[in-house]
Amino acid sequence: MPSCDGNALVIFSGGQDSTTCLGWALNRFRTVATIGFHYGQRHDVEMQCRQDVLAAIGDVRPGWKAHLGTDTVVEMGLFRELGETALTHDVAIEMGRNGLPSTFVPGRNLMFLTAAAACAYRQGIRHLVLGVCETDFSGYPDCRDDAMKAMQVALNLGMESRFVVHTPLMWLTKAQTWDMARDEGGQDFVELVLERSHTCYKGVRDVRHPWGYGCGTCPACELRRAGWDAYVAGHAVHGEGR
């Protein structure tokens, strides 16, 4: 049974983090809608993966299908026009002079959250959920707790609303994110995240590792692999299976 009285909108990309957050929300809210974005990303694979996850997640736990609401996809191609990044253009993945990786898309999460709030406003939804994290992350400033708290204030002032921005992964390591998936949906949910979610910056979907699909060498794959290895090792110490 949901533990929160209300509906939620999850910013859902089809990646590990947002998939885990979707399961978290389905356990807590009466109806959980989703929103995704075409922002000019180089690879369409993540948009296909989000559809695969949405098609399968309702069968993970009894009741999840009944709580899953509508899905909205918004076009945000302006990010390709604003400048080159490794996620929107064919450029090398490397650290920039400002200390941020070339995969950083300036303003992306801020724009996503603003668009999600506008969508939620029209649907009478108060709770916004997204999978940003300040622990195991690439250093993106728009993933930090301070940025999310500031956005909640700005959105509530600008729309005269009482939105609550939920960031369930904010202080979790990637290993703890795998633990959350197991806690929220059991081993079936862990398997769904492994098989259907997408993380790889290079869009590789034809190479399967123990931790899922990907090139295995980009920063996103390395982080996902390290988290999975720590998760498996932690459960092995306690004599548990995956």
Curated annotation (Swiss-Prot):
Pfam family, one: QueC
The organism's place on the tree of life at top rank: Bacteria
One annotated GO biological process: queuosine biosynthetic process
Binding, Zn(2+): 200, 215, 218, 221
Record keywords: ATP-binding, Ligase, Metal-binding, Nucleotide-binding, Queuosine biosynthesis, Zinc
EC number in record: 6.3.4.20
InterPro entries according to UniProt: QueC, Rossmann-like_a/b/a_fold
GO molecular function list: ATP binding; ligase activity, forming carbon-nitrogen bonds; zinc ion binding
Bound cofactor: record note: Binds 1 zinc ion per subunit.
Pathway listed: Purine metabolism; 7-cyano-7-deazaguanine biosynthesis
Coiled-coil region list: none
Residues where ATP binds: 12-22
Annotated CDD domains: QueC-like
Cofactor(s) the record lists: Zn(2+)
Its job: Catalyzes the ATP-dependent conversion of 7-carboxy-7-deazaguanine (CDG) to 7-cyano-7-deazaguanine (preQ(0)).
Family: Belongs to the QueC family.
Protein name: 7-cyano-7-deazaguanine synthase
